[in-house]
Amino acid sequence: SPDTTIAHAADLMREQGLHRLPVIENDKLVGLVTEGTIAEASPSKATSLSIFEMNYLLNKTKVKDVMLRDVITVSKFASLEDATYLMYKNKVGILPVVDNDQVSGVITDRDIFRAFLEVSGYGEEGVRVRFVTEDKVGVLEQIIHLIVEEGYNIANTVNIPTKDDRVVIEVQIDGVTDLEGIRSKFEANGLKVDEITRTTAKAI
């Protein structure tokens, strides 16, 4: 709350491994307190204050005295892409998720990183095949058709446009045992494999 001391807020961040905290009053978002705002309000290491005086100051200063009041927020109905864009555009590492002026949660840069890893299939056991090809209609469909034809399961695909009007297509496949066999299958059908690697299961 706004009346929480910055000392308590700092302790809470440290205990929970957080860098920022939304400030709530009457169930509504009124600000944001960060490690940076607390550090700016804290006495310098070069201060002549005694440890007792510093502790007194930290326990007297309230969150409302240092919090950021102009907070960028996102609706709980927004897409992950919209949230990512807002964070990127506004150079912030956290977005309170607001519904009818009430905070229902927060999304952080760590959440974005985790979502990216999950979408890209990182940490899944199988085979990842990478193609660099012309960005034209039908390429991805052809890749998928050849994989399904072999009876394999596609865990996910990622398409990354390049600056030279080409596209990087990465496909995560389950059940492949013969790497050279699947490579030959693709290349026999005119699809050059840029890289093929086994992936191991990892907890995210």
Model feature map: region roles:
Residues 132, 170-174:
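Short hydrophobic/aromatic beta-strand micro-patches
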Residues 35-72, 84-88, 102, 108-144, ...:
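Tandem CBS (Bateman) regulatory domains
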Residues 1-17, 24, 73-91, 98, ...:
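The conserved cystathionine-beta-synthase
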